[in-house]
Amino acid sequence: MRKERVSEYLAERRTLRLALLALILLTAILSLVSYFTPLGARYWNYKAIKRIEAMGIKAPFTFAVFGDNKNSSRVFKGLLRRVAADREILFAMDLGDLVYDGDKEKFRYFLNQIKGFPKPLLTAIGNHELREEGRALYYRLFGPYYYSFTVGNSYFIVLDDANEAGLEPWEWDWLRKELEKAQAYRHRFIFFHVPLYDPRNPGQGNLESKIVIALGKKMFAHCLKDRRQADKLAKLFARYHVTHIFASHIHAYYTGRWDGVPFTITGGAGAELVGNDPEHDFYHYLKVHVGRERVKVELVKLPTPPYHWGIRLLEAAWVYLRSFMVIHWLNLILFILIVGLLVDLHRFWKKR
């Protein structure tokens, strides 16, 4: 009886229904092929450092810093285009939250975004890379979680504090040795994802901001959870005369000093903007101008949605929806085709 029903179903509107089944099969095959295709990149940061070394850079020079693109499509693409076109910028540093989570396809999408970027691009690991199997995948693609390199008169140290607690004991030992070596250089730059402290004051702002704060006070503890570790790191950086600290994690722009050491939080590379403060909550990246004696950090703003909390919430929802559609477009097509088939089957059975 079932075979008869299937034959009867295919007999009606035969061409259309066979085409639908063929499309479902083809889309499923393409989706599987895409998923099992190797990502290609291996030890990305090591290769980027080698490219920088081959350039023989001397001071003065300029590099870019940004963070929290988190699978953003439109904003991050525009950011990369501007950085690539800027002749002053020789290389770039992405401070983490490269992806929304550790899903393989989200890493594939990020790699597709940066594979055509003409300048060396280095990364730090963010907390979103730790989700699912992301930590192991990050290591295979980008290499060690913390590392160092030199450019001209400057020493660059990239740390892993993505667990939001602090550094592991072996990373502490490594950091102290690196800071000792860095004393031979004029400038010492530190990069990590999670800031030592959250510079935002939840008691300030307009009524809209206070409502958002009341609904989610955790947002204002977007820093290392272990205050002792944060204090210890701040004192260590001050003791070794660090020139500048760069962090992200907070989707905004902040600058100031931790134990006398200048810091900049730059989390405006495309992830959702929660706040609506015109002085801080906008898309942006940094240009860091390194001279023989001085360092200047220049803020470069990008097109940003209006500063209204309702529009910001809609924009945040659209950022996630757009990224999901771009990354999982094959699966979405497959889902729509299957739904169409089920609706057609339901109508056919209902007529009988």
Q: Each predicted region: which residue ranges?
A:
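A short C-terminal boundary segment appended to hydrolase-like catalytic domains
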Residues: 40-48, 254-259, 279, 286-352
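N-terminal Lys/Arg-rich, disordered targeting/topogenic segments
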Residues: 1-18, 351-352
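N-terminal active-site segment of His-dependent metallophosphoesterases
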Residues: 28-109, 199
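Active-site glycine-centered loops adjacent to acidic/histidine catalytic or metal-binding residues
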Residues: 68, 96-97, 126-127, 193, ...
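Extended active-site neighborhood of metal-dependent phosphoesterases/phosphodiesterases
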Residues: 40-46, 51, 55, 104-188, ...
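Hydrophobic membrane-insertion alpha-helices, especially the h-region
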Residues: 19-34, 335-338
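Hydrophobic beta-strand anchors of alpha/beta hydrolase catalytic cores
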Residues: 63, 92, 156, 188-189
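Short, solvent-exposed beta-strand-terminating loops
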Residues: 35, 192-205
